[in-house]
């Protein structure tokens, strides 16, 4: 795909507006997982190093649009950036009518979702954003699937619209994994909801040699095989669809599972066959035999696409399945690409970031790209590159 890249431009003295993905978890005013900020830092540093007048912004959480709410302020991100950068960093709350930025200074523009019209890709708001800059840098792959004012609309009106290094790297890595993957290719789709990922499973079934399902998705497949899943999270209305996928694809369904009688961090885990799940139990992880079976499959893979954990890894007693799978991916010689918020949290927890070939910052965008959908922000950048 042909887009203008930020790395090809001279940014010295230019007003540069970077739309990053700084949507990080915050607790008590502190950033609790900095993966997305870390991923955005090289782009920010490159613009500062070139002597640009740099503005960066993002959404954070889901505030009521058009209203300021301290709970969703980018202030914790600003404090984090102050620790990491030697350049001056400041937060600007009201910026739609203009903002002064010095060369080598970083101005963080407050949460874009505080601006009315952001989510609807409002043209007036988009033009106000565009008026702030000479160069618009789209670097938030995680929101590239949404046509919003700060990810899409601004790019139509800015003098120059380009892809930041992070976005460009995402597109290159995903292209490598999906267009001509080294084989065998294994795709892992986990997490809680089947409905949101069934189209992904369908698309992946056409390109992957082996599909692996985990989490609530696996529970639906266990039910499709006629097993009782008790009180487990699963989607009864999608059992027939799971049956269809089982007949058309090679999908290993867990043979053993870890169950509990309550969904809680302190719940004790019982390892048992899928044949023995009781009516008052819920499946919260795959069992050891199932996890080892998946580890063997992953050992022989040449390309691995990983989206979603195979169990409730946030609870220590139901972590083992995801840990075995995560370590198998880390130990594999395959080109591995991982995406999705829960997946990133698991990678952090098990300390394997340096052993994954490429970690995507996108969740929904990652899945939509996998499905072969057009990402509005990318389409806009391609359009602007033609002019």
UniProtKB/Swiss-Prot annotation:
<dbReference type="GO" id="GO:0043531">
    <property type="term" value="F:ADP binding"/>
</dbReference>
<keyword id="KW-0007">Acetylation</keyword>
<feature type="binding site">
    <location>
        <begin position="59"/>
        <end position="62"/>
    </location>
    <ligand>
        <name>substrate</name>
    </ligand>
</feature>
<feature type="binding site">
    <location>
        <position position="197"/>
    </location>
    <ligand>
        <name>ATP</name>
    </ligand>
</feature>
<dbReference type="InterPro" id="IPR036043">
    <property type="entry name" value="Phosphoglycerate_kinase_sf"/>
</dbReference>
<dbReference type="GO" id="GO:0005524">
    <property type="term" value="F:ATP binding"/>
</dbReference>
<keyword id="KW-0418">Kinase</keyword>
<keyword id="KW-0324">Glycolysis</keyword>
<dbReference type="GO" id="GO:0006096">
    <property type="term" value="P:glycolytic process"/>
</dbReference>
<feature type="binding site">
    <location>
        <position position="146"/>
    </location>
    <ligand>
        <name>substrate</name>
    </ligand>
</feature>
<dbReference type="Pfam" id="PF00162">
    <property type="entry name" value="PGK"/>
</dbReference>
<dbReference type="InterPro" id="IPR001576">
    <property type="entry name" value="Phosphoglycerate_kinase"/>
</dbReference>
<comment type="subunit">
    <text>Monomer.</text>
</comment>
<keyword id="KW-0547">Nucleotide-binding</keyword>
<feature type="binding site">
    <location>
        <begin position="21"/>
        <end position="23"/>
    </location>
    <ligand>
        <name>substrate</name>
    </ligand>
</feature>
<comment type="pathway">
    <text>Carbohydrate degradation; glycolysis; pyruvate from D-glyceraldehyde 3-phosphate: step 2/5.</text>
</comment>
<dbReference type="GO" id="GO:0006094">
    <property type="term" value="P:gluconeogenesis"/>
</dbReference>
<dbReference type="GO" id="GO:0005829">
    <property type="term" value="C:cytosol"/>
</dbReference>
<dbReference type="GO" id="GO:0004618">
    <property type="term" value="F:phosphoglycerate kinase activity"/>
</dbReference>
<feature type="binding site">
    <location>
        <begin position="340"/>
        <end position="343"/>
    </location>
    <ligand>
        <name>ATP</name>
    </ligand>
</feature>
<dbReference type="InterPro" id="IPR015911">
    <property type="entry name" value="Phosphoglycerate_kinase_CS"/>
</dbReference>
<comment type="similarity">
    <text>Belongs to the phosphoglycerate kinase family.</text>
</comment>
<feature type="binding site">
    <location>
        <position position="113"/>
    </location>
    <ligand>
        <name>substrate</name>
    </ligand>
</feature>
<feature type="modified residue" description="N6-acetyllysine">
    <location>
        <position position="84"/>
    </location>
</feature>
<protein>
    <recommendedName>
        <fullName>Phosphoglycerate kinase</fullName>
        <ecNumber>2.7.2.3</ecNumber>
    </recommendedName>
</protein>
<keyword id="KW-0067">ATP-binding</keyword>
<feature type="binding site">
    <location>
        <position position="36"/>
    </location>
    <ligand>
        <name>substrate</name>
    </ligand>
</feature>
<dbReference type="InterPro" id="IPR015824">
    <property type="entry name" value="Phosphoglycerate_kinase_N"/>
</dbReference>
<keyword id="KW-0808">Transferase</keyword>
<feature type="binding site">
    <location>
        <position position="314"/>
    </location>
    <ligand>
        <name>ATP</name>
    </ligand>
</feature>
<keyword id="KW-0963">Cytoplasm</keyword>
